[in-house]
Amino acid sequence: MKNLVSVIIPFYSNITLLKKSILSALNQTYKNVEIIVVNDNPSIKKIDELVNIKNKRLKFINNKVNLGAGLSRNKGINSSKGKYIAFLDSDDLWKKNKLYLQLMFMKKNRCVASHTSYYIKNSVGKIISKRYAKNQNYQSLIKSCDIGLSTVIIEKKVLKKLKYPFPN
């Protein structure tokens, strides 16, 4: 499987956490990725220089005004080239084989979208909560949506059917 995955990272404030998020996307075992960081903080002008990670797969977009995370994601989707869109918040990290395993699952099961389990750590790295992906039907998903956006991969063509997939 060599389909391009576009990783959309909206950013507002913490450069240190953003660098870690970018590196967790760049260090995936699945290498055919583009990472699009949408800088939603107009007071930070040269985010690429602050991040200081040189990689041809990394692209920065600067919002002229604060749009919020949702509209920043839409902007990233619109500038993406991948068949798949993956979301990664600027304070989240992925395990190294996250994209590979999830894409293989999607291919095997003919899915257009999927999400995974995840856990939450506190500032000292202790796991404080675990969220497990469950097989859910549409009704149960609507009633109790506990999907971490940073676990989602979806085909771009599905997202493009929605005019603005992320409201603010």
Question: Predicted regions span which residues?
Answer:
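Glycine-rich, basic loop-to-helix element that forms the pyrophosphate-binding segment
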Residues: N63-S80
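N-proximal low-complexity "stem/linker" segments adjacent to membrane-targeting elements
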Residues: M1-L26
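Short aromatic/hydrophobic "clamp" motif used to bind/position activated sugar donors
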Residues: I85
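Acidic donor-diphosphate engagement hotspot in glycosyltransferases and nucleotidyltransferases
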Residues: L17, K46-I47, R73, W94-L99, ...
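The conserved acidic donor/metal-binding loop of glycosyltransferases
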Residues: D89-L93, S117
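Acidic donor-binding segment of Leloir-type glycosyltransferases
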Residues: I22-N62
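Conserved nucleotide-sugar donor-binding catalytic segment
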Residues: V7, N78, Q136-N168
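Conserved donor NDP-sugar-binding/catalytic core segment of glycosyltransferases
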Residues: N97-I128
